[in-house]
């Protein structure tokens, strides 16, 4: 699934990899989750952008789709599709200015990038490193960072988007797939994800526009969480705990930055 929202007290989570894939949508007010109207197309592995009351979702599977839907705070409406159907790409932005990059079904991941202007998707310049199961953060379709992921192997690579092209910047400390991300091109977070071993991660890294720094861990290790917010106020909810029964299936954790020190707390 995917998420939208500006902070740890205002979020929208939609879709997800359950059996069968779901179109369910839930809204978070900082205290509790409330079910609202479903998406038109049930799916997982899609992109997400926007806020709790003005969101966008695009792509996903099964099968790989280019379907795009817009949320007005009450209902989802089908709008113009992606040019290339795909799942498990990185995404960021707003309901009217969004970006999607990477993903599958191309073997080893695609480098394709598409930009949304509120009406149509346009193919723009590709990532330098093709990959899938990456994460992304950014304010709109002119400013983004593409984080980690994999192709033939796990990638620590990070790329910065300026509205025209991608530039390689400093790598994350730990290469992961299926991580959550929040923030923007200059101030961001990467959290959770999966490594070859010991698999699901609780690690969090903070981005200052130049370097990544390891900071406080999540309470629950997981990958593929719903993620939204900013570097100072982020939300990590749901996700895959790896095996067995775990609170990670529905656990919500809130990130807060106080006096330049960040920490997670149970939502």
Enumerate the language-model features and the residues they cover.
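Polar, enzyme-active/binding microenvironments
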Residues: 1-267
């Amino acid at each position: 699934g995917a998420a939208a929202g500006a902070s740890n007290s205002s979020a929208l989570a939609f879709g997800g990899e359950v059996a069968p894939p779901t179109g369910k949508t839930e809204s978070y007010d900082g205290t509790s989750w409330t079910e609202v109207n479903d998406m038109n197309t049930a799916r997982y592995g899609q992109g997400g952008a926007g806020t709790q009351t003005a969101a966008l979702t695009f792509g996903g599977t099964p099968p790989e789709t280019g379907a795009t839907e817009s949320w007005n705070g009450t209902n989802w409406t089908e709008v113009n599709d992606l040019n290339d159907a795909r799942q498990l790409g990185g995404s960021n932005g707003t309901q009217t200015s969004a970006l999607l990059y990477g993903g599958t079904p191309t073997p080893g991941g695609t480098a394709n990038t598409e930009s949304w202007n509120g009406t149509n998707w346009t193919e723009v310049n590709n990532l330098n490193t093709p990959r899938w199961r990456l994460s992304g953060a950014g304010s709109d379709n002119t400013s983004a960072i593409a984080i980690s992921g994999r192709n033939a192997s796990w990638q620590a690579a990070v790329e910065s988007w300026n509205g025209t092209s991608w530039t390689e910047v400093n790598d994350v400390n730990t290469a992961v797939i299926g991580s959550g991300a929040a923030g923007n091109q200059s101030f961001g977070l990467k959290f959770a994800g999966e490594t070859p071993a010991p698999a699901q991660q609780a690690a969090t890294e903070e981005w200052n526009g130049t370097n990544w720094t390891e900071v406080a861990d999540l309470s629950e290790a997981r990958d593929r969480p719903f993620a939204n917010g900013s570097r100072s106020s982020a939300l990590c909810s749901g996700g895959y705990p790896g095996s067995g029964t775990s609170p990670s299936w529905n656990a919500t954790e809130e990130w807060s930055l106080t006096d330049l020190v960040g920490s997670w707390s149970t939502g």
